[in-house]
């Protein structure tokens, strides 16, 4: 789900979505492309501004919107990091 919808600038009902994910044991991936640099004490995004970091399975930060640079990052728990390191083909074969 997107945390902030670019067309209208409206925010997602993340607290309600997180509650549903808990109820049904679902994982939630949040796209923070339009919230990064805007929400939170230091611009860390809408998820952090609501204090939902532990309720979200993965947070995707695209740097091309607010930061105006190339690249992106995925935030999540250690198990997600280990999975991405070991199974993301473009990452596996990099040497940098």
Residue ranges and their predicted role:
Residues 1-30:
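Active-site phosphate-binding strand-loop segment of PLP-dependent enzymes
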Residues 24-27, 34, 39-96:
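Active-site C-terminal subdomain of aminotransferase-like
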């Amino acid at each position: 789900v997107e945390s902030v919808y670019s067309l209208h600038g409206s925010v997602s009902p993340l607290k309600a979505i997180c509650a549903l994910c808990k109820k049904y044991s679902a994982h939630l991936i949040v796209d923070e492309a339009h919230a990064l640099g805007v929400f939170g004490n230091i611009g860390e995004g809408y998820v952090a501004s609501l204090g939902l970091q532990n309720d979200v399975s993965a947070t995707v930060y695209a740097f091309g919107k607010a930061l105006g640079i190339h690249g992106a990052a995925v935030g999540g728990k250690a198990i997600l990091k280990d999975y991405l390191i070991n199974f993301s083909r473009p990452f596996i074969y990099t040497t940098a």
